[in-house]
Amino acid sequence: MSAITITDAAHDYLADLLSKQNTPGIGIRIFITQPGTQYAETCIAYCKPGEEKPDDEPVGLKSFTAYLDAVSVPFLEDALVDYATDRMGGQLTIKAPNAKVPMVNEDSPINERINYYLQTEINPGLASHGGAVSLVDVVDDGIAVLQFGGGCQGCGQADVTLKEGIERTLLERIPELKGVRDVTDHTNKENAYY
């Protein structure tokens, strides 16, 4: 069974679009750009015969084939393609709740694990102050170099947040991490929360 659900209404709408292309065997290709990041976008494109990638996962539907990009498949889990009619005609919608969820485990590279915890545990708390922190690099055998932005840049509490919140959380979650270092220019207090 496929990771994605294409409703009958979406199937019929897409089949009608494909029939107008006058290309026998044309299907669709579903993929996610920048999967597992906050910038992830789920896309559907025409896929003429021969344009599919060798590692795509073909999903045979009643009227056409949908090719799922192999890299995108884990991020398409629980995805739904639907078509809803309205007074203006209708709209094709794609809901992929896992598109932006990083896929990491203890074997993932250290920078991916750091980014995962920054996005899922640290930044949601900082967002309440209009701030965020991002990974610049990992140096010196396990020191995470971080940069604050938004309300955290220039904030008088940034050092406390760094040591008591961010560093503690990351060290608990990533045993081989040795510490964190802030490279933010905190002299710019224009957007500072405190």
Swiss-Prot record:
[4Fe-4S] cluster binds at residues 152, 155. Its cofactor is [4Fe-4S] cluster. One of its GO terms (biological process) is protein maturation. It holds the Pfam family Fe-S_biosyn. SUPFAM superfamilies: Fe-S cluster assembly (FSCA) domain-like, HesB-like domain. Keywords: 4Fe-4S, Iron, Iron-sulfur, Metal-binding. It comes from the Bacteria. The keyword 4Fe-4S applies. Binds 1 [4Fe-4S] cluster per subunit. The cluster is presumably bound at the interface of two monomers. One of its GO terms (molecular function) is 4 iron, 4 sulfur cluster binding. Involved in iron-sulfur cluster biogenesis. Binds a 4Fe-4S cluster, can transfer this cluster to apoproteins, and thereby intervenes in the maturation of Fe/S proteins. Could also act as a scaffold/chaperone for damaged Fe/S proteins. Belongs to the NfuA family. Homodimer. PANTHER family: FE_S BIOGENESIS PROTEIN NFUA, IRON-SULFUR CLUSTER SCAFFOLD PROTEIN NFU-RELATED. This is Fe/S biogenesis protein NfuA. It comes from Pseudomonas entomophila (strain L48). The lineage of its organism: Bacteria, Pseudomonadati, Pseudomonadota, Gammaproteobacteria, Pseudomonadales. The gene is nfuA.
